[in-house]
Amino acid sequence: MVDAAKAGQSNVGVLVGGGPAPGINGVISAITLEARNRARRVIGISDGFQWLMRGDTSHVRELEHDDVSRIHFHGGSILNTSRANPTKKSEDLKRVVESLDQLGISYLATIGGDDTMFAASQVAKHASGQIRVCHVPKTIDNDLPLPGEIPTFGFETARQLGSELVQNLMEDSRTTGRWYFVVVMGRSAGHLALGIGKATGATLSLIPEEFPGAVKISTVCDILEGAILKRKALWDRSHGVAVIAEGLLEQVSPDELSDIEGVRITHDAYGHLRLAEVDLAYILKTLVEHRFASRDLPLAVVHKNIGYELRSAPPIAFDCEYVRTLGYGAIEWLLSTDATADNAGCLVAVINGKLEYLNFASLQNSDTGKTRVRRVEIDTPSYKIAREYMIRLEKEDFADEEKLRILAQAASSPKQLCSPDEFRARFQYLTTDLKGAS
């Protein structure tokens, strides 16, 4: 509990919004230690905006050196987190600003992803310069619009742990002669799925950026089926691992999802589809296995989801170092000059080894006002090289008549024959020019 008698001071507040990510505690630690070094009191706010937007200032505590000195090694968040959204109602935003004022908080550090950043920008706007807000970008999705290839903190730890899990699944796949369909967390972008797939050399990776618009589940199944047939036909291997970004679901028609037995569509406080509640891995496993069973072709698929086990992992050294710099940078900006209505909020980033501060407005979509999403750029050498090492049906497979004959033969069974022309008609539409760096 914060001493109300001291609430008039210019305190530093810190809160966490959105899902967990490795490194959160390191940010809290760096912010607290640097603020205390500058003789500022630090108020830790529990559960994001959840209580502040109700006008409840009791879920806070003062943070001292001993509270944070070793927490940077640990996953999770000592302040917890929540997806409470104060931007839906102006009354909620007003209560947030009033609550911060009651706590004597003139400087607020928010830790979170795109939604929390948008909420932070609105708090800064509604405070009219009375509260300065600095946002520290956090998400294992890596989808905040930071310049260039700069990752959000937590991403590299999530990729490392995810890669270790997929590496184990690849060995299990080889040992047991099975396929694994691994769906990886990533609401709007395929950075994590592609990062894991490329690092491990998974058989193939599927990300939403491959599809310019809506995508059908049947198309995803066609890609997977084609990859399985090609691997069997050309290398005589009945095993493999497909890494699939859960964000594909965002581009599937809700009507198509609703038609799938057992699927229930719900949304979170920010209006996003609750992707983890739609088991894409199981849906794909069931549909692809059915395709092979209908032709009496043997296929064993295991479905696996990777996401929650990555979010609260202990951060690797990269993220431990990274978040210390970000936390310091947040305090450096917050306490550097007096806030004004025009200069009251920013995002802290490390660009070319230097601390930079990006205005909230520069990170927002001009049409919606919401935070822009950074997606995988599929026309880059990085993505095209990743495609080079995947096993998928490509244009050259249909240009080579002998290879096409072998592929068609792999898709055939005594129960259902497949001619080269039928194979071409069935799968050629999947081919692209995305393979190989240019």
Show the residue positions of the predicted features.
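Accessory alpha-helical/coil subdomains and C-terminal extensions
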Residues: 99, 107-112, 118-122, 126-134, ...
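Short glycine/serine/threonine-rich phosphate/pyrophosphate-binding segments
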Residues: 21-31, 52-53, 90-92, 111-121, ...
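C-terminal non-catalytic interaction/assembly regions of soluble proteins
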Residues: 257-438
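N-terminal phosphate-binding or glycine-rich loops at protein starts, especially the Walker A/P-loop
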Residues: 2-56
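Gly-rich Lys/Arg/Thr-decorated short loops/hinges at beta-loop-alpha junctions or inter-strand turns
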Residues: 11-14, 71-83, 138-150, 175-177, ...
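Glycine-rich oxoanion-binding loops at beta->alpha junctions
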Residues: 1-5, 52-108, 116, 140, ...
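Short, ordered loop/turn segments at secondary-structure junctions
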Residues: 17-19, 40, 45-50, 83-84, ...
